[in-house]
């Protein structure tokens, strides 16, 4: 009996000392990992926010950076690896996604978007229908470009820093989908 109790205490002490194997932050029932690997870089979760459309919860978005920051302009101007990860809370069609991106480029990066027309058309061609609980990611690596992924599957790569600046402005620009989403992503 004493031996079993001693074993249980030792096991409990080991678990307590080791902590959680993978820390995460939670919002609206979605757990976002504290770190994300993009190429050979490890990015840290800068912040996460909730995208709502009218009264509907659409997705939880997480912003990942090499160097965390609360300054949207500095993040957009920096040529560091970065990613936005969106976990959807409802089904969203390709058409609905495209409409949201069109509006986002119009509101936040109109001039840059005009110069990046071909890259943006490629983005639109890559957008999938997204189901509830699926995760879509946009991961930028300097010198390589932005990889668009659904879950673990890469949908395509769009080269160029200028495209990445226009894309990330959708969430961090002057007119994001919602101020709460932007504030959350900025931590």
Please name every model-derived segment.
Residues 68-143:
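Mid-length scaffold segments of soluble, non-membrane domains
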Residues 186-187:
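Short, solvent-exposed mixed-charge patches
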Residues 23-77, 111:
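N-terminal secretory signal peptides
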Residues 150-152:
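Short strand-turn-strand beta-turns centered on an Asx-Gly dipeptide
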Residues 155-181:
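Flexible glycine-rich active-site/ligand-binding loops centered on an Asp-His dyad
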Residues 14-21:
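C-terminal segment of classical bacterial N-terminal signal peptides
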Residues 1-8:
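Bacterial N-terminal signal peptides that target proteins for export
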Residues 34-36, 145-148:
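Short polybasic amphipathic segments
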